[in-house]
Amino acid sequence: MKNRWSDTDASEFVERYRGIRGEEFALRAYTSRLIGAEPSLVLHGGGNTSIKGTVQNLFGEHVPALFIKASGHDLASMTPQDYVAVDQAYLKRLCGLDDISDEEMVSELRTHLFDHRAPTPSIETPVHAILPGRVVDHTHADAILALTNQPQGEQHIRTALGDDIIVLPYIRPGFELAKQVASAIAAAPQAQAMVWMHHGIIVCGESPRESYERMIDLVSRAEVYLKKSATLSLPRVRETSMEVACQRLSTVAPLIRGRLARMTGDPDRPYRRMVLRPLLTPDVLAFLDTEGARNLVLSPPLTSDHLIRTKILPAWVDEPAYDDETLLANQIDASLKRYAEDYQSYLE
């Protein structure tokens, strides 16, 4: 993975934002943008970053604070003022409780903001407070998940990244994850990185650059391991040209759009119509032409970052009858009906 750090860009960023919270916060926002610019690390709204500092209260006291990205904010456009300040000491005390619900935890996060007008901090805020480094970065890196989301995933991670990495099983983000992280750090206080199975990777450092470069280094190791270990070869069972694919798109797109349109009850705009974005690239066509493409396409996504955008599974049409529009329409109807039923079942 490319290390996007640039001394020139960093200096320009500091010059632009130094006046808000100082140089370190400017660099914190700068490296957050570097992470957000890499879609194989995070997508819009995913991941989170933080830095520990202090807030001066009305009595002139400097109170330890954790400054963390607000939930859902985009790392690619972070500025120093986009970080939410939370009472650091209280966060650590919170993790000493035996159990609280996620709803209670979110309430506690909000009641211990230093500015009540600030947006809600990430659900993973207590984790950032526990980790020893001053700066913390968390991503849902594709290369890491490609290793964790398979049989013997932990073994793959340890082989790729080394035994000094803490590896935790999948735990739903929230209070229980924070408790498990606290226990793991207590057992290995020198650890600077942790992989959460089926979730992502979190690293820390004493400066924004150190933490960022640790993230890039570890993800790069995972990428190298994947390339060296790849043995699966998928033979192509057909070869669809771009010309043929475009012709098929012109046939199928109106049928899909018509079936996705929904009545609104508004006589001026009777239908809520959908616009489709075709993904017609040589790589996509080559993938769909390989043996076993159906099983791969109908595998769940790697991460919640992807899930938000793709949903749990796509609608799939077996052997589309492009030369018979009536049959093709029936195939699409059946596929969409099955998709809706499966998705409703997933929600329930």
Language model regions located:
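Glycine-rich flexible loops
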Residues: M1-E348
